[in-house]
Structure formats: structure tokens, C-alpha cells
Design a protein with these regions (language model features):
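Nucleotide-state-sensitive switch-loop elements of NTP-binding domains
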Residues: 2-11, 16-135
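Canonical P-loop GTPase G-domain recognition
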Residues: 143, 151-201
């Protein structure tokens, strides 16, 4: 592997489906590259416990928890040391940070690229079925999460009709003109091409 693992930041509001997409991506990369491909996962929650850690660990992946704060603000000083420790102890090919829903990915990216010395990609996941509610309530943060993204996943397309999905795609494209947009649904797995787009390979 490269001396410097790639870091993938998963951005998106609570309930957008970050953990589900994470597991699909991790399983795809393991199947593609073999069991020697090492993936380290950082789970960030503002609460004192993460409901997703057990699910990820049961799937066979190493999980580091950063709890009781957000890694873009109150825990930002702990992020680079955590990445450095994972790199030294696990020698991963990929580090995935599943950020809390209210995190601003640009802050994390800047911190890791400046002090953690590894390349960073940002995947922002949006819930097509709740798009209008999120836009009304959290438009500034949503815009920041989308503008920073290298790739965008419009998720839960099974809960939205074609018109809604088209509306989301158009709005997303206004906020980020260049990032690839992929679609995900609970009733069908993401394609290998879409998962490769997320991973940047």
C-alpha cells in the first residue's frame, strides 16, 4: 500500500444512511482488493455512545470511537492524533471517518491535509425523501456539506419518486457543479462503478 492511507470523510445528516453506504463501500473494496486490504473506521457521535459501532464491528472492521463531541469543532484537536495512531498501528489502506450529522467537512479536511499528511476525499450523503425538510431547516450547513464534496450520494431513492429525485439532483448540482452524483436505494445495492467513484478509484 501507499505510505499514506487515503481518508474518506462521510458527511450527511442523521438518518441519511451513512453507515449503510459505508458498509457497502467497505465490503466492495474488500471483495475487489482481497482480505489484505485494510480499512480503519472512525465513528464520531456527539453523544456518549454510538449505535453504529457494533454494526460495523460485527461486519469485521476495526472501529475507533470519538464520542461526546464533533470532530469539526470540540474534538478537532483529537482527530489528527487518532489518524496517526491508526496509521501506525493498523497500516490501513483506507481510513473512513463517519462524522456526526452536524459536522462541517471542510474543517476536518483542512486539518487532516495540513497536519495529518494524507489525502482526503469527502462523500456527502443526502436523503432524497427528506430533502425539502432539510433544506428549510438547515440550508446553510447542507450547502457547506455539498460544496465541499468530491462525490455526492443521493440516498433513499426508493422513498422518493422520479420527480423528487430529479429535483434533488438539480438542487445538488447548483451547489456543486463538478462532483459526481451517485444514487442509492434500500431495495438495490449500489453498482461497482458508483462505489469506485466514491472511493476515487
Amino acid at each position: 500500500m501507499s505510505d499514506k492511507p487515503t481518508m474518506l470523510i462521510l458527511s450527511g445528516f442523521l438518518g441519511s444512511g451513512k453507515t449503510t453506504v459505508l458498509l457497502q463501500l467497505a465490503n466492495h473494496l474488500r471483495a475487489k482488493h482481497g482480505e489484505d486490504y485494510r480499512i480503519a473506521i472512525i465513528e464520531n457521535e456527539v453523544g456518549s455512545a454510538s449505535v453504529d459501532t457494533g454494526v460495523i464491528a460485527e461486519a469485521g472492521y476495526s472501529v475507533t470511537e470519538m464520542l461526546a463531541g464533533c470532530v469539526c469543532c470540540t474534538l478537532i484537536g483529537q482527530l489528527v492524533p487518532a489518524v496517526q495512531k491508526l496509521t501506525e498501528e493498523l497500516d490501513p489502506d483506507l481510513i473512513v471517518l463517519e462524522a456526526t450529522g452536524m459536522a462541517t467537512p471542510s474543517t476536518m479536511r483542512d486539518n487532516i491535509e495540513r497536519y495529518g499528511d494524507c489525502p482526503v476525499r469527502v462523500l456527502t450523503i443526502v436523503d432524497a425523501s427528506r430533502w425539502q425538510r432539510i433544506v428549510r431547516a438547515l440550508s446553510v450547513l447542507l450547502t457547506e456539506q455539498l460544496e465541499c464534496a468530491d462525490v455526492i450520494c443521493v440516498n433513499k431513492c426508493d422513498l422518493a419518486d422520479d420527480a423528487q429525485i430529479g429535483e434533488v439532483d438539480a438542487a445538488v448540482r447548483e451547489m456543486n457543479a463538478s462532483a459526481p452524483i451517485v444514487h442509492a436505494s434500500a431495495i438495490s445495492p449500489m453498482s461497482a462503478a458508483d462505489l469506485d467513484a466514491i472511493a476515487g478509484v
